[in-house]
Amino acid sequence: MAIVEARDRIGGRTFVAEQDGQKYEIGGTWIHWGQPYVWNEIHRYGLTITESLSGAADTMSILSADGLVTDTAEAIGTDLEQILTAYCDIDGAQGRVAFANPHAASPELLASTDALSLADRFAMIPAAGRQRDLLLSFLTMNAATDPAKGGFHDQLRWWALGEYSADSLLKRLGRYKIAEGTSALALALLKDANADLALGHPVSQISVVDGAVRVRTKAMEIRCKAVVVAAPLNVLGDIDFTSGVSHERLAAQRERHVCAGTKFIARVDRSVGAWVGFAPFPNPLTMVVADREVGGKSVLVGFGPDDSIDLGDIRLIESELRKFLPGVVVEEVFAHDWTNDPYAKGGWTWFSPGQTSRVLNELQTPAPPLFFANTDWASGWRGFIDGAIEEGIRSARDLLSYLRASR
């Protein structure tokens, strides 16, 4: 078995930067026992868990047109719980009936919700004051784009995966981390694979000729019985599938998801405690969380919905953080531009209105001898590490069945 990887490392949209003995998760970070596939692997490899301070915050702030408001996490958390419940309550039962199984939406649910954007649904509910700002911030953070571009159906799926509770969902999204770093999990999986690894070889073309697969890069050509294509959705369209893939699948592969936000990690000159900040769209920052403290100084993680923050401009980042934390000084920033990364072209997965109905089934359907596995079309925690493992298991099962049948 051979792994042909475009990057100079494995791990996709997750990797760890290390400095002065500290690990900084530049991409995917948080995990939870409510994400069963990744939790199983964490225990398989004996990895340990640590927590972000923001996962048990005691204070929260909301930046709105009326200025900055800081309150207890309990008070603001109650507001978020109330307004997000109203937003996701499409059946009078908090979504529990309509989306009883978050891994498998019914055709009826898709028909009634998939065409809506986050903004469409936002306009349907009475939201005012800080509840309005909280909800708009949270929705923008989740989709990492303008709420008019993000699909409402994906928010419903997250809500169901979070057990129909804002508090429960937040714990799954941003409380627990792998102490050794996500790269440690990726390396453990690679070691178990016992595969030949070719780094720095972007695949340019895949074709099927007489039942065999030909994979081409700039430097080499590989012929094999079958291939698992693990490129993310926003990159699939860059690979030339000359044969073996239907027109319908090619169309699905060319339709990108909409997550195009920014993430950075900033070490600042003071402790801000266990704190979370929210700001509604179109603020350049929609959410900032205190991850941990190093030497009495906070390490913050900030998220924005677009490219309005230059990730290489430490003073601009400082200026935006001062809107939440007056006078704060940024000492160092760690970041990666995932949207302009040629092997990612975006962050975690968020579908546009109608996209689930258009592409999900096609993306999940194998085209032997070609198989496709990426978190971007997982049924459950799509866009998360958990979804990547889910898709890997599914495609491995399909591949083994194909190889056994073709002997």
Which residues does each predicted region cover?
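Glycine-rich FAD pyrophosphate-binding loop
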Residues: 1-19
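Dinucleotide-binding Rossmann-like beta1-alpha1 core, especially the glycine-rich loop
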Residues: 22-95
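Active-site rim elements
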Residues: 24-31, 103-111, 171-179, 250-255, ...
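Short helix-loop capping/hinge motifs at secondary-structure junctions, enriched
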Residues: 69, 271-276, 309-310
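Active-site/ligand-binding neighborhood in enzyme catalytic cores
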Residues: 99-201, 230, 240
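Central helical "cap/lid" subdomain
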Residues: 201-202, 207-208, 216-276, 323
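Conserved flavin/dinucleotide-binding core of flavoenzymes
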Residues: 212, 277-407
